[in-house]
């Protein structure tokens, strides 16, 4: 009897019409992206169906950022619609070269849903006629200067990547986009409104984008600024973890070391640090583990010391030790634990070892002194001001500083680069907020039931 019933069910199911596939009931006729830099990015789609189209929802994510955003297109339901969703770039800034992956989810009146295949779009500054050079590691864009100018910057960037791999054991994970703006005004028009007028460039580490002002007659600056910011991006990607950043002195010190700034005449970093050492005015590594000073002279000292400490680690402990240190940080270690595992010293011990190597007076470690455990993870940005000469001698002077910039990029210029929180705006994630509300409601209900 059971066998007969099962057979009847199978026969009836075969006789019933098969449910319509979404691809049959909803058809995408056309889709694409239109954009104008610093104004908008508009995603367009044309759809038809057997039933009225009720909903067209765009999902998009900026490569390098963790959140996926959602946008609902507005239209009047019909069996054929043309609609779009616009990202306002006057408010939600993205740097040039940002890569966006996106897809649509279309729903009709019958509840059928179609998800389009994910596509990729690179957001460009369309106001310039870019020349390009590229390989699997880098894409260089410039519009002022001849081929030799572009070749020089591209070769320097590739040498920097080779040096980072040799000296720190780190490889670039994805292609980095480098934009060379031919004037300071053009650069300022390309970056977020919060940038300072002295900014010479920015590195958007999470986006994998560098933007720098290098005119054809200022190639010397470009040959330093490009490696500096490129180092920030590579190191950030290599040590990225959900627990915290690497110490500020290590991050900036690697950028100074890899760019060759320690031996650039207009920086004068070695003479500067020697002068501060003679005056017993060196900063402690504990101080340099977090934010750098806002004062320009002190900021330059911070960059110079950081670069020399990184040089000391590589020369004294070895390249393998530096590679091990970065790997430990990538796993989410605290500052002192990472240093002790890789070098056998904590922050205070490393500080005094380096001071001894330059014949500087040791520091007395305060009783109960501690080093910041680790910095909060951040979307970072570095800033480079325009080149200035740095005086050396008895009274150290500093070049233009790279102060902390609010909410987005990192900057570069022949002055120190500074890190900031927010390498780009995070896209909204409504679902996370709803989950948080649900958790709070659950606990409140539970406590009320228990009479708490």
Describe each model-derived feature in a short phrase.
Residues 333-336, 418-424, 438, 443:
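C-terminal soluble interaction/assembly domains
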Residues 197-209, 214, 220-225, 237-381:
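Acidic/His/Gly-enriched intrinsically disordered linker/tail segments
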Residues 7-23, 137, 359-421, 429:
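Ser/Thr-rich, Proline-interspersed low-complexity disordered segments
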Residues 431-452:
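C-terminal membrane-anchoring or membrane-association module
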Residues 19-131, 136-139, 452:
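Glycan-association/targeting regions that enable binding to alpha-glucans and other polysaccharides
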Residues 1-6:
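Bacterial N-terminal signal peptides that target proteins for export
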Residues 129-247, 275, 292, 302, ...:
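Juxtacatalytic substrate-recognition/specificity segment
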Residues 50, 145, 183-184, 261-263:
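Solvent-exposed coil/turn segments that connect beta secondary-structure elements
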């Amino acid at each position: 009897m059971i066998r007969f019933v099962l057979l009847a069910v199978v026969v009836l199911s075969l006789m019933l019409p098969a449910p319509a596939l979404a691809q049959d009931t909803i058809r995408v006729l056309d889709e694409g992206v239109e954009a104008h830099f610093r104004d908008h990015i508009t995603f367009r789609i044309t759809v038809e169906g057997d039933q009225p189209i009720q909903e067209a929802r765009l999902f998009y994510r900026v490569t390098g950022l963790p959140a996926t955003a959602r946008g609902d297109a507005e239209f009047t339901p019909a069996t054929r619609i043309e609609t779009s969703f616009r990202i306002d770039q006057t408010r939600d800034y993205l740097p040039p070269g940002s890569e966006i992956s996106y897809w649509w989810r279309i729903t009709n009146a019958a509840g059928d849903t179609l998800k389009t295949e994910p596509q990729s779009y690179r957001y460009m500054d369309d106001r310039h006629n870019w020349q390009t050079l590229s390989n699997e590691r880098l894409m260089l864009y410039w519009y002022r200067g001849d081929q030799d100018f572009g070749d020089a910057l591209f070769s320097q960037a590739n040498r920097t990547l080779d040096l980072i791999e040799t000296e720190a054991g780190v490889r670039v994970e994805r292609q980095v986009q480098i934009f060379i703006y031919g004037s300071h005004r053009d650069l300022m028009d390309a970056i977020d409104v919060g940038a300072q007028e002295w900014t010479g460039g920015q590195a958007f580490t999470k986006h994998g984008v560098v933007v720098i002002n290098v005119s054809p007659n200022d190639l010397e600056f470009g040959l330093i600024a490009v490696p500096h910011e490129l180092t920030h991006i590579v190191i950030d990607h290599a040590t990225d973890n959900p627990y915290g950043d690497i110490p500020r002195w290590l991050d900036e010190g690697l950028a100074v070391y890899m760019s060759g700034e320690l031996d650039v005449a207009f920086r004068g970093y070695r003479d500067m640090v020697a002068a501060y050492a003679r005056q017993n005015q060196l900063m402690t590594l504990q101080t340099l583990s977090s934010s750098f000073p806002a004062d320009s002279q002190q900021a330059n000292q911070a960059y110079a010391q950081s670069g020399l400490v990184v040089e000391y680690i590589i020369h004294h402990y070895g390249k393998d030790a530096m590679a091990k240190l970065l790997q430990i940080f990538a796993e989410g270690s605290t500052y002192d634990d990472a240093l002790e595992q890789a070098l056998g010293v904590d922050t205070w011990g490393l500080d005094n070892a380096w001071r001894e190597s330059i014949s500087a007076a040791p520091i007395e470690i305060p009783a109960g002194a501690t080093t910041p455990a680790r910095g909060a993870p951040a979307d970072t940005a570095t800033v480079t001001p325009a080149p200035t000469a740095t005086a050396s001698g008895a009274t150290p002077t500093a070049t233009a500083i790279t102060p902390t910039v609010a909410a987005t990029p990192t900057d570069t210029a022949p002055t120190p680069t500074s890190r900031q929180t927010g390498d780009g705006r995070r896209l909204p994630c409504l679902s996370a907020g709803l989950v948080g509300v649900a958790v709070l409601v659950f606990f409140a209900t539970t406590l009320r039931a228990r009479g708490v």
